[in-house]
Amino acid sequence: MCSIGEDDFGDDGAAHAMAVESLPLGIVLSPGNCSKCDVNSDELYKLNFRTAECRECFLAYARHKFRAALGAAKILPRNAEVLLVLDGSAESLVLLDMLHFAQTQNTFKRLHCNARVVYVEEQQVQGRDPVHLEALQNLSTQYAPFDFYVIELGALPSSMQRIKDYSPSLNANNELIHKLQKLRSLTARQDYLQQQRKNLICSVAQCLRCTHVFESNISVDLATQLLTAIALGRGGSAALDVALLDDRLSGDVKLLRPLKDLNEQEIQFYIHAQRLKPLFQKGSRYGREHGQTASLQNLTSAFVANLQQNYASTVSTVFRTGDKIAANSNPEQSSCVHCRSTLDTELSDTLLAIEYSRSVSEAGVSLYKSGQDLEDLAKKRLENKDGLCHACRAIQAELDSGNLL
């Protein structure tokens, strides 16, 4: 029987509306007794709205969230082939450490799955130096017997290599980089890059014959992603963007987010408790260096972060709202050939207005055309059988030349 109370793992609920305690929050407090096990400890961990606890009790609490996310929904079959996506962030290292711990328990507590790890090298796309190989090799040694692979974003799935055989590519003719340069706005570039990354991970999973993919998104990531999806015109698929299970990937590959219930403070405490060393910070992701107002994604992220500082319930409210949105699961509807989201085949007045405005803008000096002609052109665009959803069609419209696919 678990010795940790059930109340420790529930939704924070109304606790978010409480005034912040006067007790200082931090990793290291003065030595004392753990409020859970009553053992004297030199280092206590104090989370928001929780009493101070020792390292072992905190780790048990955090790891229980990981196991509970997978166990409650029973979505991971026994002995499933799992691909863990590593990007060097603190969140991905926490996921790696938790999965490794779950794999090294005794038979009764062990998470029965066969795991592999793939590191997606994104630094070349961002114009930065690649990660130090020594750091990756140290991770491979520390988390044996997991098999570690490396693939560069924008490369073919067949170019994937084991960590011991990998050397950074010096090829500057990355097709993905050239296509990103053709997109006019940072919003379109970030959206396109996210879809390309997801498609690459799916292809890697198929190459390794993995049926499930673990990603390290936490609650604040999913809250931001929900609002971003709506702003980009991906509201129809927003439910799957924040769900524990995303089954839109091709080849029956399922994407899981087992850290969805963890917050940023818990991640930072776990990093400290396990003495993990992230390879990159979250703020180093593509396009963040251009500022908060450079794209819809950056602006939404800053908006959520600023609200969270003043109103502690922001992330929880948005995140839990996303949990309540039902996904459209009609198997008869076609999917977008780029992002795999369900296509909306009904003629929407909103989309018609957007395409009408775009037609007027492109007409220029040809505005002598009647309004009916422009409306017919807008309808024709919406009925175009290009296989793209509204959001991906917007990316296509941003391309100076060429095709999205």
Curated annotation (Swiss-Prot):
Its main location: cytoplasm. SUPFAM superfamilies: Adenine nucleotide alpha hydrolases-like. The keyword Transcription does not apply. Signal peptide: none annotated. Keywords: Cytoplasm, tRNA processing. One of its GO terms (molecular function) is tRNA binding. GO terms for biological process: protein urmylation; tRNA thio-modification; tRNA wobble position uridine thiolation; tRNA wobble uridine modification. Pathway: tRNA modification; 5-methoxycarbonylmethyl-2-thiouridine-tRNA biosynthesis. GO terms for cellular component: cytosol. It is found in: Cytoplasm. Plays a central role in 2-thiolation of mcm(5)S(2)U at tRNA wobble positions of tRNA(Lys), tRNA(Glu) and tRNA(Gln). May act by forming a heterodimer with NCS6/CTU1 that ligates sulfur from thiocarboxylated URM1 onto the uridine of tRNAs at wobble position. Belongs to the CTU2/NCS2 family. HAMAP family: CTU2. This is Cytoplasmic tRNA 2-thiolation protein 2.
